[in-house]
Amino acid sequence: MKLIRKITIGKDYKNDAMHYSVGQDVYGGHKIDSIVEEKDKFSIYIKKGKEVLPWKDFNKNMAISISF
């Protein structure tokens, strides 16, 4: 398991990709708590208060760019 600072999903980095960074505000007042590389996927976890929840998973077969 590796921790990641930023993940970008999509073939066209500048125009059509979705960018997610640790600390970014998302969904209903939550913040991205961590982005984790697992064996066959990347997982994004969000946090609100003390509660951390799984939010999104991305298959490793997708066009992905990561920053550590």
Language model segments and positions:
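Acidic, low-complexity, intrinsically disordered interaction modules
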Residues: 17-63
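Short intrinsically disordered terminal tails
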Residues: 1-2, 67-68
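A short beta-strand micro-motif
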Residues: 2-16
